[in-house]
């Protein structure tokens, strides 16, 4: 395999998730032979990638959400790579944003970081792990409230 243009496009985790899910469905429908070594390697990589990505916030995203997020990000002066990191990781704290935005101390004020955090958390849906941790903490809080 030869890389013609390494910087042709940046893909979000959501786009990779959709691409691999569609590829998996096409293979199921066509009933392709899975006996070749190359095909087995591709199946293993596809499986592991889908397994990982399905635990991230991108699993709950849609094209409309991605478009809304990118439109909202226009007011923030961020690079494409920084926007992509925010989209892929859905930071929930100011520290996470500071780690994703290069030279954030010089480029962003605390108010801008808070506005960015609000934009990210209000537009992008929570990931499966975030939802599980919320339900676990809610269950623990309910157990504490119940008289023993």
UniProtKB/Swiss-Prot annotation:
The keyword Cytoplasm does not apply. InterPro entries: HRDC-like_sf, RNA_pol_Rpb4/RPC9_core, Rpb4/RPC9, Rpb4/RPC9_sf, RPC9. One of its GO terms (molecular function) is nucleotide binding. One of its GO terms (biological process) is transcription initiation at RNA polymerase III promoter. Keywords: Antiviral defense, Cell membrane, DNA-directed RNA polymerase, Immunity, Innate immunity, Membrane, Nucleus, Transcription. Gene3D superfamilies: 1.20.1250.40. It holds the Pfam family RNA_pol_Rpb4. It is a peripheral membrane protein. SUPFAM superfamilies: HRDC-like. Coiled coil: none annotated. Its main location: nucleus. SMART domains: RPOL4c (SM00657). It is found in: Nucleus; Cell membrane. Belongs to the eukaryotic RPC9 RNA polymerase subunit family. DNA-dependent RNA polymerase catalyzes the transcription of DNA into RNA using the four ribonucleoside triphosphates as substrates. Specific peripheric component of RNA polymerase III (Pol III) which synthesizes small non-coding RNAs including 5S rRNA, snRNAs, tRNAs and miRNAs from at least 500 distinct genomic loci. With POLR3H/RPC8 forms a mobile stalk that protrudes from Pol III core and functions primarily in transcription initiation. Pol III plays a key role in sensing and limiting infection by intracellular bacteria and DNA viruses. This is DNA-directed RNA polymerase III subunit RPC9. It comes from Rattus norvegicus. The lineage of its organism: Eukaryota, Metazoa, Chordata, Craniata, Vertebrata.
């Amino acid at each position: 395999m030869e890389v013609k243009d390494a910087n042709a496009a940046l893909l979000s985790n959501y786009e990779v998730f959709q691409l691999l899910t569609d590829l998996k469905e096409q293979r199921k429908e066509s009933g392709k032979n899975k006996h070749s070594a190359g095909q087995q390697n591709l199946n293993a990589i596809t499986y592991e990638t889908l397994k990982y990505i399905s635990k991230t916030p991108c699993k709950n995203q849609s094209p409309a959400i991605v478009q809304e997020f990118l439109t909202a990000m226009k007011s923030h002066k961020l690079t494409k790579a920084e926007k992509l990191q925010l989209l892929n990781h859905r930071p929930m704290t100011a520290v996470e944003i500071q780690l994703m935005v290069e030279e954030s101390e010089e480029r962003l004020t605390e108010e801008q970081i808070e506005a960015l955090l609000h934009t990210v958390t209000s537009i992008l849906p929570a990931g499966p792990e975030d939802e599980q941790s919320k339900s676990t903490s809610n269950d623990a809080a309910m157990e504490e409230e119940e008289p023993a």
